[in-house]
């Protein structure tokens, strides 16, 4: 047992962030820019940052702006399409671009190392989906954020938008697509490493790799004590504030903290796989992110897409994701993760959520039965001329969907949720999509809830507006501000200078 007196000043921190992924690194950069003297510790159990969900191959989608993802615009029972989530995600991603633009202007990061621009396309070929896409286009394009969206059912034009997608299609097939040319591909692994390179030069931010959090405790109103274990030794550090940003590992850490707010949460792990193509004769002929619509009855996570990705500078095509199931909460986790997470407070909610999501379980079972031939068959809905030999299977990351006890029983949630202690001294980010692309907006919300007093000071307000000039404004209702923000972002990040 460690006692407070055994902890030296070098192991006392203003903030301790668990997990060296995009969430913790974003929060660390924000805190450091707002208070350069703040002592921050980042703890990562693996030997390098960004190896779990932040890694580009592990991340289900990059450059999320709700331009083309159907799961953010569901069809309602009244025949209307719900677009509020798409508007929220789009403005959140613009905040991320704004933040990166400011850091680039200050020389902290280089956009060329992690950011590429390419069109985002929604593509359909079924009769019911044609009507859905047209209505989606009409509703979204009436909003300022999406007013540059294009729609077409002209096959000649669509062949210009996505040549290899249109090759080999039956002449009688009806197709349609929408396009937003101002789309992005983001290598969040590269961005995270760039964040850490900048932070390590500060002297006030410390990163400890190959270090695992064994326990988290707090006595009264004292700082949090975190018991750590590295390859060399075991020791304890103190943190006035703790952020659990360990992806799928955040739930178990939240449970260890013992805060009552985390008592009724559980998790349902879902693994993923991609078909990957690195053949230049294929990759050179496709430069877009193309999203289709999920089959009727399939869960939102099943939305198929053909992604152009630049990963560590190399252009690849990824198709999927194909879902799977195992009991790990992290890609490099333990098969006991799910079982260890079951407690008296969440077992009822987990059982009820399972019973209410039999269709999801059936879907996952079906995905597990697929072989390479059946996966390529799915790919050929997008690329009729795709050749099996050009594509190989790659294991993606783990996502842990939130199971939450509510007044109506256990519910499975598909988004992200921040769980905080009543005094704001500890916060955990649970869930998955859209995740990385909205990290800046998520972390600003965390600052409001956990650092509210400092957030109200003039110095923090001024520094935030230096980082995010539109801070405090609603971009979806302020057309002139949105235009000015996008013009600035495009100029500083280099939109139009490449991939066009």
Curated annotation (Swiss-Prot):
Per the UniProt entry, the disulfide pairs are none
UniProt keywords (A-Z) are: FAD, Flavoprotein, Oxidoreductase, Tricarboxylic acid cycle
Question: Which residue stretches, if any, does this entry annotate as coiled coil?
Answer: none
Q: Name one GO molecular function term.
A: 2-hydroxyglutarate dehydrogenase activity
* One Pfam entry name: Mqo
Is Phosphoprotein found in the keyword set? no
Report the pathway entry: Carbohydrate metabolism; tricarboxylic acid cycle; oxaloacetate from (S)-malate (quinone route): step 1/1
Which cofactor does this sequence's record say it needs? FAD
Please verify whether the record's keywords include Manganese: no
Enumerate the SUPFAM superfamilies for this protein. FAD/NAD(P)-binding domain (SSF51905)
Q: What class of enzyme is it?
A: oxidoreductase
Task: Quote the EC number.
Answer: 1.1.5.4
Any GO BP annotation: tricarboxylic acid cycle
Known catalytic reactions: (S)-malate + a quinone = a quinol + oxaloacetate
> Which family does the record assign?
Belongs to the MQO family.
Indicate what this protein is called per its UniProt record.
Probable malate:quinone oxidoreductase
């Amino acid at each position: 047992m460690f006692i407070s007196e055994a902890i030296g000043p070098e192991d006392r921190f203003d903030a301790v962030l668990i997990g060296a992924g995009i969430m913790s690194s974003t929060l660390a950069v924000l805190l450091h820019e707002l208070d350069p003297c703040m002592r921050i510790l980042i703890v990562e159990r693996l030997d390098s940052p960004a190896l779990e969900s932040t890694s580009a191959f592990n991340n289900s989608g990059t450059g999320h702006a709700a331009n083309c993802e159907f799961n953010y615009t569901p069809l309602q029972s009244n025949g209307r399409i719900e677009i509020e989530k798409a508007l929220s995600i789009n403005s959140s991603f613009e905040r991320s671009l704004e933040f990166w633009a400011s850091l680039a202007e200050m020389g902290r990061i280089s956009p060329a190392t992690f950011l590429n621009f390419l069109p985002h396309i929604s593509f359909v070929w079924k009769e019911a989906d044609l009507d859905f896409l047209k209505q989606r286009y009409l509703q979204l394009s009436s909003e300022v954020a999406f007013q540059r969206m294009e729609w077409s059912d002209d096959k000649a034009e669509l062949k210009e938008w996505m040549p290899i997608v249109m090759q080999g299609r039956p002449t009688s097939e009806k197709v349609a697509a929408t396009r937003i040319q101002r789309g992005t591909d983001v290598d969040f692994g590269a961005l995270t490493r760039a964040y850490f390179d900048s932070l390590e030069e500060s002297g006030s931010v410390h990163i400890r790799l190959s270090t695992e959090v064994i326990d988290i405790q707090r006595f009264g109103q004292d700082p949090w004590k975190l018991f750590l274990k590295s390859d060399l030794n075991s020791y304890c550090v103190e943190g006035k504030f703790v952020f659990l940003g360990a992806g799928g590992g955040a739930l178990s850490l939240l449970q260890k903290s013992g805060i009552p707010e985390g008592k009724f949460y559980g998790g349902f792990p879902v693994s993923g796989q991609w078909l990957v193509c690195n053949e230049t004769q294929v990759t050179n002929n496709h430069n877009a992110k193309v999203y289709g619509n999920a089959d009727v009855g399939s869960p939102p996570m099943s939305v198929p897409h053909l992604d152009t990705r630049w990963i560590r500078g190399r252009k690849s095509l990824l198709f999927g994701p194909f879902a799977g199931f195992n009991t790990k909460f992290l890609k490099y986790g333990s098969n006991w993760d799910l079982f260890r997470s079951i407690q008296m407070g969440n077992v009822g909610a987990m059982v009820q959520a399972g019973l209410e999501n039999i269709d999801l379980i059936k879907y996952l079972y079906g995905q597990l039965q697929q072989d390479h031939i059946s996966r390529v068959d799915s790919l050929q809905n997008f690329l009729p001329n795709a050749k099996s030999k050009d594509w190989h299977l790659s294991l993606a990351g783990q996502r842990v969907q939130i199971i939450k006890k509510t007044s109506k029983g256990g519910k499975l949630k598909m988004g992200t949720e921040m769980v905080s202690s009543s005094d704001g001294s500890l916060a955990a980010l649970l869930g998955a999509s859209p995740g990385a692309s909205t990290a800046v907006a998520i972390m600003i919300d965390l600052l409001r809830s956990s650092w509210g007093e400092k957030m109200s000071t003039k110095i923090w307000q001024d520094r935030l507006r230096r980082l995010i000039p539109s801070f405090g404004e609603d971009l979806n209702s302020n057309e002139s501000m949105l235009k000015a923000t996008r013009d600035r972002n495009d100029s500083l990040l280099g939109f139009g200078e490449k991939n066009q």
